[in-house]
Regions:
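Short, polar/charged alpha-helical segment
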Residues: 21, 27-51, 60, 64
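Short helix-initiation/N-cap motifs at beta->coil->alpha
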Residues: 52-63, 152-180
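Ligand-binding "clamshell"
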Residues: 83-96, 109-112, 184, 189, ...
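A bilobed periplasmic-binding-protein/Venus flytrap-type ligand-binding module shared by bacterial periplasmic
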Residues: 103-114, 219-232
């Protein structure tokens, strides 16, 4: 995860031409991305000065952004931000733009495709709301379970399963531990960043993974800020920076194309 903060000095507006210090906080592979971006020629061309910090907790990143000690963050999906806004009344984060899509995958050391997973198998699923809901939607798309018609993409839980014909057992885990428990369960649902950190490539190693469509668009990653900053021109330049040719070539090569660029208007996510 990663967080961008644009520190302003002398009380000057972010819309002036003065240099800004942008503090970026993140974790996992996103941290690597923004460490590179901070030193890039593309950032220099846009007169953006970034300082990157590694912060491991997503809620803390969002808290700091909503409270104003951080100006921008870039680590989460639209659904993660939406869940945060729902669960933290009085706060409001908004998306400045889209970045990329990281397919969530189903992994197994024992089986090579979902249909091979036997009745009663144990499937590990994230213990945080948005990742758990996303994982259940992944299992639904694989034809393994059925969910309520009004299933909430951000807060849905295993209690919303309407059909589980194979009687799968679900084990909730800290989603950052997925790669480490592959040998102790039948299958694990793992987010792309965590999988990559664990030496897994979602496009090559998963037995099933997401694709971008109307049902998964909520999982596109974003750059977020507090509501009051949504029209800040300097902050919006970060979106342009991310989509520059130089940065996209780096991301594609560094992460073996597992971070799929998405250049869509924010309205597409809603």
């Amino acid at each position: 995860m990663l967080l961008l903060v644009f520190g302003l000095s002398n009380g000057k507006s972010a819309d002036t031409n003065d240099s800004k210090t942008i503090v970026v906080g993140s974790t996992n592979t996103d941290y690597q991305v923004w460490k590179h971006i901070a030193k890039s020629n593309a950032a220099k061309k846009l007169n953006l000065h970034l300082k990157v910090k590694n912060i491991t907790n997503g809620v803390q990143l969002n808290d700091a952004t909503s409270q104003g000690s951080l100006d921008v963050n870039a680590f989460q999906s639209w659904s993660y931000m939406d869940t945060y806004n729902r669960q933290h009344k009085g706060t409001k984060l908004v998306a400045l733009g889209t970045t990329y899509y990281e397919p969530m995958g189903l992994y197994s050391k024992k089986y090579s495709k979902p249909t091979e997973i036997p009745d009663g198998a144990t499937i590990a699923i994230a213990d945080n709301p948005s990742q758990a809901a996303r994982g259940l939607l992944l299992l639904k798309s694989a034809g393994m379970i059925k969910l309520k018609s009004n299933f909430d993409y951000a807060t849905g839980t295993v209690s919303d399963i309407t059909e589980n014909p194979h009687k799968y057992q679900f084990k909730q885990i800290d989603d950052t531990t997925g790669p480490r428990i592959l040998n102790s369960v039948d299958a694990v649902i793992i987010s792309n960043s965590v999988a990559f950190d664990g030496g897994l490539n979602v496009l090559k190693d998963s037995i099933y993974h997401e694709t971008i469509n109307k049902n998964t668009r909520y999982n596109i990653n974003i750059i977020a800020t507090a509501k009051k900053n949504e029209n800040n021109k300097e902050y919006k330049k970060i979106v342009k920076l991310f989509h520059s040719k130089e940065i996209q070539e780096y991301v594609g090569k560094k992460f073996d194309h597992t971070k799929v660029e998405v250049k869509k208007p924010v309205s597409y996510l809603k």
